[in-house]
């Protein structure tokens, strides 16, 4: 039996990664989100949660959970704190994804294994995957999407983008680049074409 292809979808903030993954999932792929996995670790009274509390302080505990908003306010704009938080979370996220992949392989029911990893290249994790799909979009378009979706500020967008490596560098390294500067329908069509091409390599 051929191994189940491991595909990562990555890209800058508000580029369209989640939308692409939704299309892949609708077409039958198994999809997992690194962000959602990391959020699942944001609970107190666990070893990971306690390490995060030790790093950022007990004030991040709100209503018996670790507040993502409180965490974001502390780490965005403070690179040292952000990197320290990532050093706690990313190994756990990668371990979880690899365990999930092993489980999905055994199920033998999905054509592709897709993992949405925003900071794939930044944490040096691309080599684990068979192929990397980069979703790209112009900065102005991404900012407009971010502001509309989150109600955040230009500053909050810029702070989030600061952690990401250059788009040009990622384009050179990615196996597939899907541009998302047009309509949602145009983008979804491109992703569907990508899915068909990937299935053809199995």
From Swiss-Prot:
Entry EC number(s): 2.7.1.24
Role summary: Catalyzes the phosphorylation of the 3'-hydroxyl group of dephosphocoenzyme A to form coenzyme A.
Top-level taxon: Bacteria
Binding of ATP, residues: 14-19
GO molecular function: ATP binding; dephospho-CoA kinase activity
UniProt lineage: Bacteria, Pseudomonadati, Chlamydiota, Chlamydiia, Chlamydiales
NCBIfam families: dephospho-CoA kinase
Gene responsible for this protein: coaE
Family indicated by similarity: Belongs to the CoaE family.
Organism of this sequence: Chlamydia trachomatis serovar A (strain ATCC VR-571B / DSM 19440 / HAR-13)
Record-given protein name: Dephospho-CoA kinase
CDD domains assigned: DPCK
Broad class of enzyme this protein falls into: transferase
PROSITE patterns: DPCK
Domain DPCK: 6-202
Gene Ontology BP annotations: coenzyme A biosynthetic process
Main location, first listed in the record: cytoplasm
Catalytic activity reported: 3'-dephospho-CoA + ATP = ADP + CoA + H(+)
Pathway: Cofactor biosynthesis; coenzyme A biosynthesis; CoA from (R)-pantothenate: step 5/5
Subcellular localization: Cytoplasm
């Amino acid at each position: 039996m051929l191994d189940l292809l491991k595909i990562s979808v990555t890209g800058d903030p508000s580029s369209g990664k989640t939308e692409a993954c939704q299309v892949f999932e609708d077409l039958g792929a198994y999809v997992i989100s690194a962000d959602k996995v990391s959020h699942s670790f944001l609970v107190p009274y666990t070893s990971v949660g306690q390490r995060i509390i030790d790093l950022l302080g007990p004030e991040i505990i709100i209503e018996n959970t670790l507040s993502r908003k409180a965490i974001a306010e502390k780490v965005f704009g403070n690179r040292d704190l952000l990197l320290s938080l990532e050093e706690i979370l990313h190994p756990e996220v990668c371990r979880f994804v690899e365990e999930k992949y092993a489980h999905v392989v055994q199920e033998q029911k999905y054509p592709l294994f897709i993992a949405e990893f925003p900071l794939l290249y930044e944490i040096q994790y691309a080599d684990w995957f068979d192929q990397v799909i980069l979703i790209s979009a112009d900065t102005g378009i991404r900012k407009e999407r971010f502001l509309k979706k989150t109600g955040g500020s230009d500053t909050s967008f810029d702070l989030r983008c600061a952690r990401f490596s250059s788009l040009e560098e990622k384009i050179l390294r990615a196996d597939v680049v899907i541009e998302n500067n047009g309509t949602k329908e145009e983008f979804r069509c491109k992703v569907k074409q990508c899915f068909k091409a990937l299935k053809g390599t199995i």
